[in-house]
UniProtKB/Swiss-Prot annotation:
Signal peptide positions (record): none
The species this protein was found in: Alkaliphilus oremlandii (strain OhILAs)
Binding note for cofactor: Binds 2 [4Fe-4S] clusters. One cluster is coordinated with 3 cysteines and an exchangeable S-adenosyl-L-methionine.
Name the record gives this protein: Ribosomal protein uS12 methylthiotransferase RimO
Catalysis performed (reactions): L-aspartate(89)-[ribosomal protein uS12]-hydrogen + (sulfur carrier)-SH + AH2 + 2 S-adenosyl-L-methionine = 3-methylsulfanyl-L-aspartate(89)-[ribosomal protein uS12]-hydrogen + (sulfur carrier)-H + 5'-deoxyadenosine + L-methionine + A + S-adenosyl-L-homocysteine + 2 H(+)
Amino acid sequence: MNVGFISLGCSKNLVVTEEIIGLFKSNHFNIVNKKEDAEIIVINTCGFIESAKQEAINTILEMAKLKNNKCKYLIVAGCLVQRYKKELEKAIPEVDLFISISEYKQIWKEIENLLDLETGKESNLDYHNRVLTTGSNMAYLKIGEGCDNHCTYCAIPNIQGPYISRTMEDILKEARNLAKQGIKELIVIAQDTTKYGLDIYGEARLPQLLEELCKIEDIEWVRFLYVYPESITDELIKVVGENDKICNYFDIPIQHISDSVLKRMNRKSDGASVRNIIEKIRREIPDVIIRTTLIVGFPGETEEDFKELYEFVEETKFDKLGVFAYSKEDNTPAAKLKEQIHHATKKSRLRKIMALQEKISRESLEQKVGNVYKVLIESRTKGGNYYIGRTYMDVPDMDGVVYIVNNTKENLMNTFVDCRIQRAKDYDLFGELYTEGK
């Protein structure tokens, strides 16, 4: 039977989708890209914030229409199901099977029952049985599940449960296997990568893990995402600064800078410590790229709080920045707080931060013009006039790309090249191959 997949939400969810694809493939199902050709459609949902929930519902309803054609079975899994399974079963009867995260241990049994199959296999989700969907060069490497931070706005601890690290041996085994498949870049992910190892080793071991990953011969780039400011150690900064394979890129979701807002969010850092860690990273690693995520319109955020945040962004000049309007989530402490901010105010504050960041980003990219960067080529434009790639400054699907004029007869796909930047536009860079001295 033909099976099609849709993965919604974050990269951590994508890894689960890749594991589910691996389950079907190892049981001899045919994986198809076009949903119109699929007899089974599997949707792995996100349920983190309101916009993600709405996207998931819309996608489910859209795919349900295909049951009038080839699609015989519609399966929905993931975070949205974990949060609202009973409600979804009542509201969308077109779905044949809802699988929550807590049911993943028996996922294949559930699917066998639905399809009336008996493979006789004890099949479970397995990091080592993933089918990669991220192309030939890059793979996400998930090092843990769940979260212990309990920020008051966030439903993830309720959805995913407590933080559980994988053993370093298991992670390295997967990483070596990915390298054998031709993967050149590993992106280390978890809800909080800086907490890695704390639960099984009694101490955080992200720096040691990164060093071990750098020893894998065919891996050329290692980067990590989702590091919390209070857990960034001198050792981590030192390891990043001293290892050529580790991209000088810190993704630090600070959420806010006002002490009063951070306290209501139950964040473990205050404004001063956030400022200090950013200054320290930039001092120790001069060419570092720092990305952050902010929330505006959190309950009780005053005009003074927002002004402090705006001025902080203006002064700090983050290289990359994402901002969300606060989303009131069921069964979270923040949803019960008084002084909920009006929707229009949240949107206004979001627009102001984004307008400021667009200006900062444009100025930052213009400073790159004339410089030469190592670029990983991943695709081409339709006409083939440009190669498209990324520098160490760019995370897939989060940041920009580099367009490189294709003026060579060589096939540069899936290779690293040197590129001289000629111009910047919006969030992207344009350049030419740099061969001087070669």
